[in-house]
Amino acid sequence: MARVKRAKNARKNHKKVLKLAKGYYGGKSKLFKTANESVIRALRNSYVGRKNKKRDYRRLWIARINAATRINGLSYSKFMNGIKLAGIDINRKMLSEIAINDAKAFADLVEVAKKQLNA
């Protein structure tokens, strides 16, 4: 029988991977090779998902701001330009929250942007 020189390390690695694969269906939670492939894929997808989440939220905020500004008679790009010219430094997340929760305050911001664009 061949000598195994890395039994402790291999066992430790296998246990770690199988622990991460707990709850997966069938062989993906029982067999090391398939479990390892599934865990690697899952970790990669979760990493990518964390990066995509930032993009997705920014797109959502911009869509909300755009909808609210068009209700008040202005486009998103002109609104953002007017806000910057007015020296109002509010990020898109806060602007979208204001647009949803306080329509009157958002309408006031749109008016400020319109004045700056006309000036």
UniProtKB/Swiss-Prot annotation:
Question: Which GO terms of type biological process are on file?
Answer: ribosomal large subunit assembly; translation
Question: Where is it found, in Gene Ontology cellular component terms?
Answer: ribonucleoprotein complex; ribosome
Q: Which SUPFAM superfamilies match?
A: Ribosomal protein L20
Tell me the keywords, alphabetical order. Ribonucleoprotein, Ribosomal protein, RNA-binding, rRNA-binding
Q: Which Gene3D superfamilies match?
A: 6.10.160.10, Ribosomal protein L20
Molecular function (GO) terms for this protein are:
rRNA binding; structural constituent of ribosome
RNA-binding found in the keyword field: yes
Q: Which Pfam families match?
A: Ribosomal_L20
**Per the database entry, which stretches of residues form a coiled coil?**
none
Q: Which family does it belong to?
A: Belongs to the bacterial ribosomal protein bL20 family.
Query: What does it do?
Result: Binds directly to 23S ribosomal RNA and is necessary for the in vitro assembly process of the 50S ribosomal subunit. It is not involved in the protein synthesizing functions of that subunit.
Query: Under which name does UniProt file this protein?
Result: Large ribosomal subunit protein bL20
Originating organism: Clostridium botulinum (strain Eklund 17B / Type B)
The upper taxonomy is: Bacteria, Bacillati, Bacillota, Clostridia, Eubacteriales
